[in-house]
């Protein structure tokens, strides 16, 4: 069994969830988020692209309904003992099979919370669930319950986060060895991802973002590779990933001599990062974090070039994204708590001058000032050859 946490850790998590369920007066929950299943049981798969559901009750039952392809996956990677299979066939309805399973679990008329807000729940499944369960039980949206619990990391989780951060640093060191005029983006990506795999890391929740020249202004991955010019810019956003826990980083590297605009934008990003660090303390909100970022950026005249969010929580995430909640945007009332892992990204994209500048790193919050998990310098990275 490939469990990455102690039995005591899993028991503590289930106890936390049952306490929240009791407070919310829920008899059971239907878990569709792969992150929830991994956190609660260790179950590790990308099989959530198909229908699967983990039913948990306040009495302590855990029953997984999944496909045959994931039966052994659940046995090998989780502490779930009751694994049931829905059958692939022409008129198969896993929702009806789930309803029958809930009846067998004596949950007719129960109060059941459902995880709707997750990539493991399609609109079609949601419609079918609502149609079948509305008259069967008292159902409600419980999407935020486990994410709120996952946001604060345990000591066992923090060990993996620190390892992910170490791998993220190694990935950037590997990239800097490759970045030069004439370098191919493919070799840079290969070096970064190779450093993480060689260090025992995992695939991240989404692709690494890489773009040079005009495409250095992009915040998402896209297909196609480019060779760096004599004077160029390349934006990298990547994450070390270990046991699915992420530590993200972001840098724009200047190839050749930085322009005055690069220097101006870097100064704004550096000041903004310093400002948000003062807000990464218990009692502040994720809205406060964003406000600190916006104030510094706007003071440098960067309002039209910045984004409307400047970071987010990180943890054990699955595709299609390593981004977790809460997110730092204006007015978000979510509170900063000790032992959160938060990625702060200062992103400036000036389409007028075709200039990019980014600066980002991951922090662990404490009872006081935050701890940066990276050992990389915050200087503007420049490669001249």
PLM features: residue spans?
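Active-site neighborhoods and metal-handling regions in enzymes and metal-associated proteins
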Residues: 1-385
